[in-house]
Design a protein with these regions (language model features):
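Sec-dependent N-terminal signal peptides
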Residues: 4-13
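Bacterial Sec-pathway N-terminal export signals of envelope proteins
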Residues: 19-67, 73, 216-258, 306-307, ...
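Periplasmic alpha-helical coiled-coil/stalk elements that build and connect Gram-negative outer-membrane
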Residues: 21, 131-245, 256, 345-348
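Surface positions of alpha-helical coiled-coils, especially the charged/polar e/g heptad sites
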Residues: 22, 29, 36, 103, ...
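Small/polar (Gly/Ser/Thr/Ala-rich) solvent-exposed segments
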Residues: 38, 61-84, 88, 99-127, ...
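Amphipathic alpha-helical coiled-coil segments
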Residues: 39-54, 128, 132-153, 162, ...
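Hydrophobic, lipid-facing positions within transmembrane beta-strands of outer-membrane proteins
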Residues: 60, 92-96, 239, 297-303, ...
Length: 348
């Protein structure tokens, strides 16, 4: 629930200079170097390239083809059955072809889906940024706390050792009983165990810090002093409205539902006709024993209607309908979870 108001917290939190310099430096380091965050940025780049690929389907395609063959005629007869003169040829053919798709009912839906994909990738990136910033703050404060606990436990062990030495002298003088001295030894053993645990927590917290934020050069530079002033919504209704606008889980579910709708349109378009137009110019040399060169232009219009393919396309439509229903249920669940979370956070 802390994450719900993280944007507001980051906007309205003010800290003392020493803490701000170190914490903000750590947050900046995490923002630029965190592996999960960089992976999400690459995912956004992938979505942008997918959109470019889809745009290319609206543009004509051009290709150059060249082929050379060797033709050896073993036998050649004329109409009367006699042998004809054999002239072997080695034709060389080069062609240039330009083709443009004129009608494709799924092309527009695919383009819109890819545009939604960019918005979806951006929302996931924003969500990951907030998650990493939140984890970085937890890692920073967790390491500061672990170091302080280690120091407190170290001082406690030193105190117990001093007390043990004092009680040993008192035992020799008969001022305390053996049972009292044993209790002091037991207390020292407990303090040492807590100190070892605190040392382990420092190691664990340091590893977590370096995993989330990056390399830690000097632990002594970490500061714990902080004064924060957080602006919170004025009412529960205001909090719910803000969460509807800013909750990334809800936005992601909405965008995934829109993508599922486009998938249905794309699947249905596979059953619709498509049309293309192409222009090809070819050049041939040593074409045959009769002709040496040929230059030919071919203008071709093609219409295709794949109305049946063994039921595969209809099954794909049914599958995408089920995916859309699932995404709608996930969106409803995200909205309810968001409302429950905000209400619970406000009550606490």
């Amino acid at each position: 629930m802390k994450k719900i108001f993280l944007v507001l917290i980051l906007t309205f939190v003010y800290v003392e200079n020493a803490f701000a310099e170190d914490l903000l430096k750590a947050l900046k380091q995490a923002f630029h170097n965190n592996a999960e965050l960089n992976a999400e940025r690459e995912n956004l780049n992938v979505s942008e390239q997918d959109l470019k690929i889809t745009k290319s389907e609206y543009l004509p395609s051009a290709s150059i083809t060249s082929s050379k063959s060797q033709e050896d005629t073993n036998k050649l007869t004329n109409q009367s059955g006699g042998d004809a003169t054999i002239s072997d040829v080695n034709p060389l053919t080069t062609s240039i072809k330009i083709e443009q798709t004129l009608i494709d009912f799924g092309r527009s839906a695919d383009y819109k889906k890819k545009k939604i994909g960019i918005d979806l990738a951006r929302q996931k990136l924003l969500k990951k940024e907030q998650d990493i910033i939140f984890k970085a703050i937890e890692a920073y404060s967790g390491l500061v706390l672990a170091i302080e606990k280690e120091e407190i436990n170290k001082q406690n062990v030193d105190l117990k050792i001093s007390q043990l030495q004092t009680d040993k002298i008192r035992l020799e003088r008969g001022q305390i009983k053996v049972s009292d001295f044993s209790q002091t030894e037991s207390s020292l053993a407990g303090a040492e165990a807590q100190y070892i645990q605190a040392q382990n927590e420092v190691v664990s917290s340091r590893l977590n810090y370096e995993n989330v934020i990056g390399t830690l050069i000097n632990e002594n530079s970490l500061q714990k002093s902080i004064k924060s002033f957080v602006k919170i919504p004025i009412s529960l209704e205001n909090a719910i409205e803000l969460s509807k606008q800013n909750n990334h889980d809800v936005k992601i579910a909405q965008l995934e539902l829109e993508q599922a709708k486009k998938d249905i349109i794309i699947a249905k378009s596979d059953l619709a006709p498509s049309a293309s137009l192409s222009l090809e110019r070819s050049y041939s040399e040593d074409l045959s024993s009769t002709y040496d060169e040929r230059e030919k232009d071919i203008l071709k219009a093609t219409v295709s209607w794949p109305f049946f393919s063994g039921g595969k396309k209809f099954a794909t439509i049914d599958k995408n309908e089920s995916i859309k229903a699932r995404q709608r249920l996930l969106l409803d669940s995200a909205v309810r979870n968001n409302l429950t979370a905000v209400t619970s956070a406000w009550a606490n």
